[in-house]
Amino acid sequence: MRAVWALLWALQLGTLVGCALVLGVHHFSGDNLTKQSAIPTKSSKAKPISDQKAAVTSGSTCAVREKARKDGLVLLDGNWYNVEKFVHHHPGGVEVLEQYLGADISFVFRVMHRNPTQIMKYRKPVRAATPEELEALTSRRQEVCLDMMDDFVTNSIDIASPEMLPKPTQFDLKSFEKDFIDLYEEFVAQGYFKPSTTWLLWNTAVLISIIALSVISMKVLPPTSFVLPGALLGLFWHQSGFLMHDAEHHNLAGNERLNDILGWIYGTVFLGVNGAWWREEHREHHAFLNTYDDESGFKDPQMREDVWIQNKKLIPFFGDEIIHFLTNFQHILFLPIIFIVGRVGIVVDSTLTERKFRPWTILGNVCHILLHYAILSQTSRPIPVYIIGSLWQAILSLQLLGNHYVKPWNRLNDATEGNFCVWQILSTQDFACPRWSRWLYGGLNFHYSHHLFPTLSREYFHITSPRIRTLCEKHGLPFIEIAFIDCVVGMVNNFNEVRKDFATKGHGSVAFMYT
């Protein structure tokens, strides 16, 4: 019993000490880069619209979009709507809507909201867009899409065959956009966006069965047999994470409050990862996938880490902080960091970087500790069991990162001026896996389905994925399926290539310290 309590409280103490060290390193690391210090923290508030207008730094912007941005307009189905007063009340986050000002949101609005028709029922447009405005925006979208395809070819290191490359000569933007709107409407008609109570109850029963088997194995197996109980504990966390992910997308129940409660249970209580924190950051991950801004750095919070650089375009945001010297060894450190400190890192991060205080987060943390005390007290080897479980959870981290880490990065302003579907397709890949193992990926092996249609219930991903592949092939876009092991190898190779550039082109003395 004492060992269990020591383990749990050591983790909490380690959390506080670790955070103190990180804060100290950042505080005493000298004058940081202007660009790096401008990168918003996870608790920072979004800029006012007036500041956001000035922050746009794109080499080529659309004049129509810039005028509409200044007026606080968005384009939906050919009509301009004024959202300037609504921006700061946007449930999905202030910055999410700010970054789409002036853009055509016809597709992204539909797929990001479960009830788009109801939302727009009583909203009146300011005016219809003129043919000249529509043509200018379409022309800019086409330009951005072709630039993204070119960047994909130039900067991808994991392309195994020419079939994986975009074919710009096959791409026609208007036909592409019509096909994807039609596909969305087909999925709606088929009921693929409706949550299933039966599916939820079944998966929750499986989850409870896993942790029950872990406890039973602790009682039945010899005291020295800690691998199976630990693996089952890790699998419990692993699958809890996927259900938290579904809940925080509001894909498990028809009621948003109930989804938030389920996210709290599966995430904060079962997994130990703050569900509300995940929801806030994950919304931005979908809206800002693999993007950055020349002035403020990373825009996709879930693809940012201070200890490694995934893409050469991100090098200017690294170099002068002490912790950045680790990027010189990122190809070596990546897997050890994921496996050794991955679980503790995300538990700490989700608790201490929550954007606003929520009492139920503290309650969830207490429930998590009590639950795991009850579980780990059933074995005489709680520490090895916990360690094995943490190692298993590292697989979850690799699964979540592998879908995007080797894919291209774009300036956010350019990305939002382009086509949402093209952007998501070029920044994503699927995992190729046998049918029997799909459950281990939480459905996210079908990642194109998830990123193109975030509110789609994952029980239908196996149906929607072939339809998406067909449209990608028709329009000359890559649809990449890669084995999990090959993906991990690709990430390590990518880190090795990027760190070479960082060593020669990085900013600040840290970049050259170990070259």
From Swiss-Prot:
Location(s) in or outside the cell: Membrane
Any Pfam family hit: Cyt-b5
One Gene Ontology molecular-function label: oxidoreductase activity, acting on paired donors, with oxidation of a pair of donors resulting in the reduction of molecular oxygen to two molecules of water
Keywords in alphabetical order: Electron transport, Heme, Iron, Lipid metabolism, Membrane, Metal-binding, Oxidoreductase, Sphingolipid metabolism, Transmembrane, Transmembrane helix, Transport
Chain positions of motif Histidine box-3: 447-451
Catalytic function, reaction form: a (4E,8E)-4-sphinga-4,8-dienine ceramide + 2 Fe(II)-[cytochrome b5] + O2 + 2 H(+) = an N-acyl-(4E,8E,10E)-sphingatrienine + 2 Fe(III)-[cytochrome b5] + 2 H2O
Main location class: membrane
Entry GO terms, CC: membrane
Keyword Transmembrane helix attached: yes
Spans through the membrane: 3-23, 198-218, 258-278, 322-342, 359-379, 382-402
An annotated GO BP: lipid metabolic process
Coiled coil stretches, renumbered: none
Motif (Histidine box-2): 281-286
Positions contributing to heme binding: H90, H113
Short motif (Histidine box-1): ranges: 245-249
Bilayer topology term: Multi-pass membrane protein
Residue ranges of domain Cytochrome b5 heme-binding in the record: 46-113
Domain notes: The histidine box domains may contain the active site and/or be involved in metal ion binding.
Cited function: Fatty acid desaturase that catalyzes the introduction of the third double bond at the Delta(10) position in d18:3Delta4,8,10 triunsaturated sphingolipid long fatty acid chains. The cytochrome b5 domain probably acts as the direct electron donor to the active site of the desaturase.
Protein name, as recorded: Sphingolipid 10-desaturase
UniProt organism field: Thalassiosira pseudonana
Gene: desA
